[in-house]
Regions:
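Membrane-embedded alpha-helical signal segments
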Residues: 1-188
Length: 188
């Protein structure tokens, strides 16, 4: 769980969401991208995982057996490779980490937002992506994250405007961004 905090911009990027779970006496930690997950299925999985009627033991002993018995609504797999975990979270599936286990459960409950994504009329391109932004920030950040699957991609949300208090997102890739320029932008 500590490694996840080091690899993902948890608490910094608004579209990265987490949830603490308690599976009996065992702590779990879920990570996903807001807008990429089917929330109804996730809620059912969370409910089943934490249901005291299903908890025979207060401690999870075998992660494979636990996964097979408790997760029936989604495709689930195990991995102990952090590159695989990061790649999966950033491409749609979410991850469930359970304290005391080296393996993570990858939950494929992805649901990409859809809308007729048209090429902007005023900005024709000859090469590259032809996606156009829409009205909702979450949808737009999902469009970007589908193309750039870097764990260093961060979206910081800020309010601008004295009266309108409009939400804007500052998007950048840690390690590539000019920190001085980023600080200047944050203060504007």
């Amino acid at each position: 769980i500590q490694t996840a905090g080091e690899l993902f911009p948890i608490g910094t990027s608004f579209d990265l969401i987490t949830r603490d779970l308690y599976l009996g006496d065992t702590r779990g930690y879920w990570i996903g991208i807001n807008g990429f997950c089917k929330t109804e299925i996730l809620q059912q999985i969370f409910s089943d995982l934490q249901n005291p009627l299903y908890m025979k033991d207060s401690v999870v002993e075998n992660i494979q057996n636990y996964m097979n018995a408790r997760i029936g609504y989604a495709q689930a797999s195990l991995t102990d490779d952090w590159d695989t975990i990061v790649r999966n979270v950033l491409s749609g599936p979410s991850v469930l980490l359970i304290d005391g286990f080296a393996q993570a459960i990858i939950l494929d409950v992805r649901s990409y937002p859809t809308r007729g994504i048209d090429e902007p009329d005023t900005e024709k391109v000859t090469r590259g992506s032809r996606d156009g932004f829409v009205e909702t920030m979450l949808f737009n950040t999902n469009l970007i994250r589908r193309r750039i699957r870097s764990p260093q991609l961060t979206f910081e949300i800020q309010n601008v405007g004295t009266e309108s208090k409009t939400d804007v997102a500052i998007a950048y890739i840690k390690g590539y961004v000019n920190e001085e320029l980023l600080d200047t932008l944050r203060k504007k």
